[in-house]
């Protein structure tokens, strides 16, 4: 069930003012405590505008990949990851992770109409015959692939930094 911005804001403010706990506040406003918890996280991370979900959002392949890599590389819950990236539902993140595990970064590149298409590796031969739409799709694919590689490199570097930090701490002890 969708709730208005006003109801969300009133429930969050009621809880944050200390009038009641999450479960009591959820009962008072007749909503689920998980939704309220998510709204509180959104509000605390992004302010009141994050509670206004009137517009259907679309996310770039780079954004999706960034969220998935963050979720897989950190031990935060999916609702917390969704709140961190201002995504209205943790199920969106869950679906992105499923797609990523099934198809890798290509899960985010394909549009619904393009799902049956396969990417050709002999692009140099086909470049002269490509339509502008195919060129745009190729560019989108290469950008997403580049973003994926950069994100993966950053993820691996961060992991390496953490390992080095652990070694330093254990050698000092």
Swiss-Prot record:
Segments for region (Disordered): 115-135
Matches recorded under SUPFAM superfamilies: Homeodomain-like, TrpR-like
Signal sequence interval, chain numbering: none
Transmembrane segments: none
Xref: Gene3D superfamilies: Winged helix-like DNA-binding domain superfamily/Winged helix DNA-binding domain (1.10.10.10)
Pfam families: HTH_28
Keywords associated with the record: Transposable element
Annotated GO MF terms: sequence-specific DNA binding
UniProt KW Calcium keyword: no
Domain of life assignment: Bacteria
Entry's family note: Belongs to the IS150/IS1296 orfA family.
Protein name: Insertion element IS1397 uncharacterized 20.1 kDa protein
């Amino acid at each position: 069930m969708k709730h208005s911005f006003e109801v969300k804001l009133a429930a969050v403010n009621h809880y944050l003012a200390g009038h009641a706990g999450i479960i009591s506040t959820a009962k008072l406003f007749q909503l689920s405590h998980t939704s309220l918890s998510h709204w509180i996280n959104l509000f605390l991370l992004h302010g009141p505008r994050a509670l206004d979900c009137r517009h259907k959002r679309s996310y770039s392949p780079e954004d999706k990949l960034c969220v998935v890599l963050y979720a897989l590389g950190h031990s935060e819950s999916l609702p917390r990851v969704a709140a961190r990236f201002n995504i209205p539902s943790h199920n969106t993140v869950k679906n992105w992770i499923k797609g990523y595990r099934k198809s890798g970064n290509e899960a985010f590149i394909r549009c619904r109409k393009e799902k049956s298409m396969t990417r050709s590796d002999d692009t140099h031969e086909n470049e002269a015959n490509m339509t502008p739409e195919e060129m745009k799709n190729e560019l989108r694919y290469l950008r997403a692939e580049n973003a994926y590689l950069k994100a993966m490199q950053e993820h691996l570097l961060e992991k390496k930094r953490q390992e080095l930090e652990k070694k330093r701490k254990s050698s000092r002890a």
